[in-house]
Amino acid sequence: LGHHSYSHPNGWWTSKKKYLADVDKAAALIPSNLFRPPYGRLRIDQHLSLKKKGFKIVFWTVVSYDFDPELRKKDLIRKMKRLTRPGAIFVFHDNPKAVPVLKNELPKLMAYWKEEGYTFKSIPNN
């Protein structure tokens, strides 16, 4: 389990000081050194400071857009299947907009991936 900041700041538009304070606020609630930058946007000064603080920065390969009510579930499933590769890191969200997908579609995807021979692993904290 990792975290994603406290208030979801865009690293490109947020000062290093504010960004790091936001990450620290989240880290106080979720004690993990795994961190995924919101929007995948992180400046080099923020990246270096986070690394110095001991964070392991983890990016992703596919965003599910599970929060988008306009995206049809069958299109989401098709997209996830098409973009599956060994080592892929998918982003799913744990917010109210994404609950229908998490409850209904994610189990179907996980069953599909297992049938295809994929396994699920945690990202190590070190």
Model regions and ranges:
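A short acidic, helix-capping loop that chelates divalent metal ions and anchors anionic groups
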Residues: 8-14, 66-68
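Short glycine-rich, flexible loops that bind phosphorylated cofactors or substrates
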Residues: 44, 98-99
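C-terminal domain-boundary segment and adjacent tail
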Residues: 100-126
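Short Gly/Pro-enriched loop/turn and capping motifs at secondary-structure junctions
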Residues: 63-65, 95-98
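Soluble non-cytosolic domains of exported or imported proteins
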Residues: 13, 17-20, 40, 74, ...
